[in-house]
């Protein structure tokens, strides 16, 4: 089974069109908010344990960070993985503490000022070269879980993963948008460390690679999992 992990302020249904594009539709996207009461390590172990027929793990942004944690756990049975626009972590404790405070502020706004929260989220510079993700379903009822995801899965709580990436021996496809400069740099460093990594850079594409360039993303994933 091919497992798709959604991004922050995302929804498992965001992956529906990509799952439908897989031959035999052999894929699913779990609701990651079921795990927000746990830290990244524990969440990763649970996801691994719930996928005995593990084939391909696909993760975008926050889901990509969770995917990397899954691959580094000793109960991982994944055969291959696709990492899209993912961060490998902050190096210094100062950076981590700043990020934790920032994510706690996001969490507070998600609970208390939802409309303001969404507006500020979409106006971030990271999305300036990306499209909105079109949804016919609401994230509003997930706001408490979204807040918890900022608190428990903050990038500030994540250890810096680059020193551990050489332990991931399975094939990795790392996808990033050429306009997403910070994550382009992260992807380049990560793929130099990973023993079996192919890096694909999509032209004229920002952070939200799957939704900025859905046809190329689906083609890349399907070619990789064959």
Which functions belong to the PLM regions below?
Residues 59-63, 67:
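Gly/Ala-rich beta-loop-alpha elbow adjacent to hydrolase catalytic centers
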Residues 205-214:
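Catalytic histidine-centered segment of alpha/beta-hydrolase-like enzymes
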Residues 168, 174-176:
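Short beta-strand/loop motif that positions the catalytic acidic residue
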Residues 72, 78-109:
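Flexible "cap/lid" loop of the alpha/beta hydrolase fold
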Residues 93-97, 109-164:
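Conserved alpha/beta-hydrolase catalytic His-Asp/Glu region
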Residues 41-55:
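Conserved acidic catalytic loop of the alpha/beta-hydrolase fold
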Residues 1-37:
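Conserved HGGG/HGGXW glycine-rich cap/lid loop of the alpha/beta-hydrolase fold
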Residues 181-186:
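Conserved alpha/beta-hydrolase "acid-adjacent" motif
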């Amino acid at each position: 089974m091919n497992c798709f992990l959604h991004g922050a302020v995302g929804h498992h249904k965001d992956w529906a069109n990509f799952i439908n594009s897989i031959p035999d539709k052999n894929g699913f996207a779990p609701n990651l908010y079921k795990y927000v009461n746990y830290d990244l390590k524990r969440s990763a172990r649970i996801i691994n344990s719930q996928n005995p027929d593990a084939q391909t793990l696909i993760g975008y942004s926050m889901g990509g960070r969770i995917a990397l944690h899954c691959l580094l756990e000793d109960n991982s049975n994944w055969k291959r993985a696709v990492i899209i626009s993912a961060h490998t972590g902050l190096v210094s404790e100062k950076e981590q503490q700043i990020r934790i405070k920032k994510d706690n502020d996001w969490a507070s706004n998600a609970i208390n000022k939802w409309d303001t929260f969404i507006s500020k989220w979409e106006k971030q510079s990271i999305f300036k070269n990306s499209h909105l993700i079109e949804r016919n379903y609401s994230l509003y009822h997930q706001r408490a879980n979204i807040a918890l995801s900022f608190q428990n899965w903050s990038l500030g709580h994540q250890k810096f993963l680059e020193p551990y990436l050489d332990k991931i021996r399975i094939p990795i496809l790392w996808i990033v948008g050429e306009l997403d400069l910070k994550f382009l740099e992260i992807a380049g460093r990560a793929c130099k460390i990973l023993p079996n990594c192919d890096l694909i850079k999509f032209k004229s594409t920002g952070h939200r690679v799957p939704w900025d360039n859905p046809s190329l993303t689906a083609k890349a994933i399907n070619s990789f999992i064959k």
